[in-house]
Amino acid sequence: VKMAELSIERIDVFQVDLPYSGGVYKLSGGREYRSFDATIVRMTTQKGIEGWGESTPFGATYIAAHALGVRSGIAEIAPKLIGLDPRRVDRINDAMDAALIGHEHAKTALDVACWDIFGKSVGLPVCELLGGRTDVNMPVISSIYMGEPEDMRKRVAEHRAQGYIGHSVKIGGEPATDAARIAAALADKKPGEFFIVDANGGLTVETALRMLRLLPHGLDFVLEAPCATWRECVSLRRRTDVPIIFDELALSDASIIQLVADDAAEGIGLKISKNGGLTRGRRHRDIALAAGYTVSVQETAGSDIAFAAIVHLGQTVPEKNLRCVLESRDIVALKTADGPFDVKEGRVMAPTLPGLGITPRLDVLGEPVASYF
């Protein structure tokens, strides 16, 4: 039986500003963010099936990605995808790589839109196509920006009151202040809660070691992205028994394989826009599972469309390996799509609707800023 034909006929690109819901978001190194520039893609097949995807970098100073680069990258890639079958996701990624080396953040929205079409074309949710859903009610994690210790403690408490059981606490300054931030954020820790302490590459080995020595004994947390370079992170790892996970340095097949080879961490923060979408995200999930790692399925930033994609990927990770899914919608003050992605008591499950299960708000998206056909 011949497979029914399906081909990409048109790609429309939308731009939306997503204001940060808490005013100013602060990361190590004096980085501040007030809003995030989202690129949203609508891919249409010759049969009228629409697929949606989003790529929203965390500003221009988090990793080597920026919003203008997403749209200029799509301009390079999109014309080469017209006429291809969106269900052949690996072949789509081959075509994207042939059109543009790297620039994974530009490929993400296109890749996710293909998966949305694939799901709709066969009447299945994306998580079933990615390997099949678990029955795990997945914990979402908060994002607590770097600030005064007691203020961070207060913001953890506010998220706890909303039902969150996981918290990502940002650090990356002077050792004594960072130690105080961690101690304050964990001061009211409840049974079953977990904490990721994320320096976003902001520590040197020296400041990390000093900070760890200043901490009260027995605090239970995982240290994420302590240092900016691979060598520094491995050096720190050799001298501490604190569990470490990589994020900014876990970007590609090669880097995650090297992570395993070097025994450099216990897990990864898997952000699909950083890694290139769900096709590559699926592969990175599998490498991590083969290594026995824990996986935090996340996004750099993003609205409802980005959140839907990571919920579907997270839903395929076995419970013992799934650390959390990042509630990316929590940090933006604009809703771009509707769908059954309600967080209840700090947990979420992927819907059973075909594709991603979202309906974009076209009035919010406005008119396309570019179209390819």
Task: Enumerate the language-model features and the residues they cover.
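Extended hydrophobic packing segments that form well-structured cores
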Residues: L356-F373
